[in-house]
Amino acid sequence: MGQVEKGKKIFVQRCAQCHTVEKAGKHKTGPNLNGILGRKTGQAAGFSYTDANRNKGITWKNETLFEYLENPKKYIPGTKMVFAGLKKQKERQDLIAYLEAATK
């Protein structure tokens, strides 16, 4: 299980330039992540996704985010997300803990 505060720091350093988490937050280069857990890939209303994201057909949950965040381009070939990923398991756990808390 990850630590929310450590995950928040990772989000601010590595994710916040492209993503927001607030309810009704705006899309940036990447989609707003509010409500991501339980949502299918490529489904944030008002965001222009690649076909690869729309067609992946998985539902975001802890396990799928954990795998995706290690190497986004490997998990969804054709995604426009330029983030290289988080190789450290603990960092991914912390980030997911933060996303769980911040995007309900």
UniProtKB/Swiss-Prot annotation:
Alphabetical GO CC annotations of the entry are:
mitochondrial intermembrane space
Could you cite one Gene Ontology molecular function of this protein?
A: heme binding
Q: Which UniProt keywords apply?
A: Electron transport, Heme, Iron, Metal-binding, Mitochondrion, Respiratory chain, Transport
Spell out the PROSITE patterns in the cross-references: CYTC
Locations listed in the record: Mitochondrion intermembrane space
Name the positions where heme c binds: 15, 18-19, 81
Q: How is it modified after translation?
A: Binds 1 c group covalently group per subunit.
Q: Which SUPFAM superfamilies does the UniProt entry name for this protein?
A: Cytochrome c (SSF46626)
Q: Write out the function statement from the record.
A: Electron carrier protein. The oxidized form of the cytochrome c heme group can accept an electron from the heme group of the cytochrome c1 subunit of cytochrome reductase. Cytochrome c then transfers this electron to the cytochrome oxidase complex, the final protein carrier in the mitochondrial electron-transport chain.
Q: Report the sequence similarity comment from the record.
A: Belongs to the cytochrome c family.
- Recorded protein name is Cytochrome c
